[in-house]
């Protein structure tokens, strides 16, 4: 496991309360973060507090079954260590550095402490570069920073893990450096599926995976992020390679810290969180940095409890990120995948000096159009689309086409949706948005833009409709000049405007409501 045994220093278990163990040492008192072993090395503990000159309080990193009062505990003399080096590539580890992929024994690695200081300010790089993901809505509206930190915020079941897995699929193949996936308190099934997918895709040779699953003690979940960063720092500082660090889920790190804090008897703060949450999160996040030798780019899934973005865990995480990608349950229910809310999401890279004047101008125009549509939705729901001015109706048409163009079929969900995955370059994504804003596709049905890659696919997906047909969306105004036909056959107008093109249901509530209005 990588721990170096020091001269024997034995202690005795005084009390066991769940994962917290009090131990008495009569000779040398172990220092903070020292690893202790009991029950013939099967039970691993980490010292978190020194009560007095004889007693320490430790948190268990393994289950404590079999541990009893009076049992001997051995001081290993060192902290928790992680394996670093080329021998760790293509392997899967637990928090102790043990391989869990049933492959050959580990070789060609060094062992380093997981407790390391962030790089000093003098070593940090201030150069700003864009990191392309191949996902249209992210690259256009909230570009990621090379060497930065991006968070995927969302409640349960809105697609955080799917989006993170798709980014792995898209970026690991074109990313020249090393990728590390760190699973903190997530499902064992997801780790197994990810390992198999990466192996089949042929990207495992440049990837390291490390897990502490939700069934493990809070101490293990609390330390696995530090172990992953230790591995990433080796490739950045020693190998001078760029790193891609993917964390699922950073909230589970905070949650594990809350459990540890409660077990240690600390006074809780707001909503039961630990009083040291800000310090603990900073100790992890500040190690993710862009230096003169290389960069660690991090993408982190962040679970938001009960979709409450004012939760202290979400608020503290927001402050460390260069890009915040917010996933919306409403958009997911409408079938607009990826369910990213373009108005709540943001990136500090979206400035003219970094992305260029054209990209910045297009992004602002897209946000403005979508924001106007969001304001008009209440009026449409109450009065109908025909009560809007012609200019507002054009805004609604552009916004709905933009929303559908910014959907994208994922490689990782092909087997569920039936749509073949698409990887779209930033240039193609910008061209598509620009052409929609110029009303180049106003004669195409909205469904032609749904779940496509580049904008040219829309032309092959659906031919422009005949101009005089009452069921077409762009002829709706003319068709309703005479209210009688609409009143006589309201049902006919509902399915006509938007023929479905995929497995997911298309959101057509606005137009369906409009037909009954007249």
Curated annotation (Swiss-Prot):
The keyword Cell membrane applies. It is found in: Cell inner membrane. SUPFAM superfamilies: C-terminal domain of alpha and beta subunits of F1 ATP synthase, N-terminal domain of alpha and beta subunits of F1 ATP synthase, P-loop containing nucleoside triphosphate hydrolases. SMART domains: AAA. Its EC number is 7.1.2.2. Keywords: ATP synthesis, ATP-binding, Cell inner membrane, Cell membrane, CF(1), Hydrogen ion transport, Ion transport, Membrane, Nucleotide-binding, Translocase, Transport. F-type ATPases have 2 components, CF(1) - the catalytic core - and CF(0) - the membrane proton channel. CF(1) has five subunits: alpha(3), beta(3), gamma(1), delta(1), epsilon(1). CF(0) has three main subunits: a(1), b(2) and c(9-12). The alpha and beta chains form an alternating ring which encloses part of the gamma chain. CF(1) is attached to CF(0) by a central stalk formed by the gamma and epsilon chains, while a peripheral stalk is formed by the delta and b chains. NCBIfam families: alt_F1F0_F1_bet, atpD. This is ATP synthase subunit beta 2. It comes from Albidiferax ferrireducens (strain ATCC BAA-621 / DSM 15236 / T118) (Rhodoferax ferrireducens). The gene is atpD2.
């Amino acid at each position: 496991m990588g721990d170096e045994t020091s001269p024997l220093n034995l202690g005795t278990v005084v009390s066991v309360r769940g994962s917290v163990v009090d131990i008495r040492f009569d000779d040398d008192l172990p220092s903070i973060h020292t690893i202790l072993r009991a029950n013939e090395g099967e039970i691993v503990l980490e010292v978190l507090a020194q009560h007095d000159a004889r007693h320490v309080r430790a948190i268990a990193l393994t289950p404590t079954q079999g541990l009893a009062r009076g049992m001997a505990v051995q001081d290993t003399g060192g902290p928790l260590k992680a394996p670093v080096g080329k021998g760790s590539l293509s392997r899967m580890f637990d928090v102790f550095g043990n391989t869990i992929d049933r492959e050959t024994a580990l070789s060609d690695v060094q062992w380093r402490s997981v407790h390391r200081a962030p790089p000093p300010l003098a070593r940090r790089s201030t150069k700003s570069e864009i990191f392309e993901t191949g996902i249209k809505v992210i690259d256009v509206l909230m570009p990621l920073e090379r060497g930065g930190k991006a968070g995927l915020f969302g409640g349960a079941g809105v697609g955080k893990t799917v989006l993170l897995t798709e980014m792995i699929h898209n970026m690991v193949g074109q990313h020249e450096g090393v990728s590390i996936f760190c699973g903190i308190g997530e499902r064992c099934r997801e780790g197994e599926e990810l390992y198999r997918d990466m192996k089949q895709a042929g990207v495992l040779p440049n990837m390291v995976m490390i897990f502490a699953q939700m069934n493990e003690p809070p101490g293990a979940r609390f330390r696995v992020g530090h172990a992953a960063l230790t591995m990433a720092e080796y490739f950045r500082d020693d190998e001078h390679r760029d790193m891609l660090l993917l964390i699922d889920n950073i909230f589970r790190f905070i949650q594990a810290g809350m459990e540890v804090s409660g077990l240690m008897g600390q006074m809780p703060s707001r909503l039961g969180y630990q009083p040291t949450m800000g310090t603990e999160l900073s100790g992890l996040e500040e190690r993710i940095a862009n230096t003169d030798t290389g960069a660690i780019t991090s993408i982190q899934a962040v679970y938001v409890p009960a979709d409450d973005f004012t939760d202290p865990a979400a608020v503290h995480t927001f402050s460390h990120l260069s890009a915040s990608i917010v996933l919306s349950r409403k958009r997911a229910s409408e079938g607009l995948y990826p369910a990213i809310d373009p108005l709540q999401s943001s990136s500090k890279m979206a400035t003219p000096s970094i992305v260029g004047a054209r990209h910045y101008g297009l992004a602002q125009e897209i946000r403005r159009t979508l924001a106007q549509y969001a304001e008009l939705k209440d009026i449409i729901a109450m009065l109908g689309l025909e009560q809007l001015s012609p200019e507002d109706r054009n805004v609604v048409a552009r916004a709905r086409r933009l929303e559908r163009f910014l959907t994208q079929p994922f490689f990782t969900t092909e087997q569920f949706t039936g749509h073949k995955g698409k990887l779209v370059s930033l240039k193609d994504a910008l061209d598509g948005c620009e052409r929609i804003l110029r009303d180049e596709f106003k004669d195409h049905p909205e469904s032609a833009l749904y779940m496509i890659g580049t904008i040219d696919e829309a032309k092959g997906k659906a031919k422009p409709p005949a101009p005089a047909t009452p069921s077409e969306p762009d002829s709706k105004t003319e068709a309703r000049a005479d209210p009688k036909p609409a009143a006589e056959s309201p049902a006919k107008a509902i399915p006509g405007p938007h023929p479905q093109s995929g497995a997911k249901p298309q959101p057509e509530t606005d137009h369906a409501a409009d037909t009954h209005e007249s």
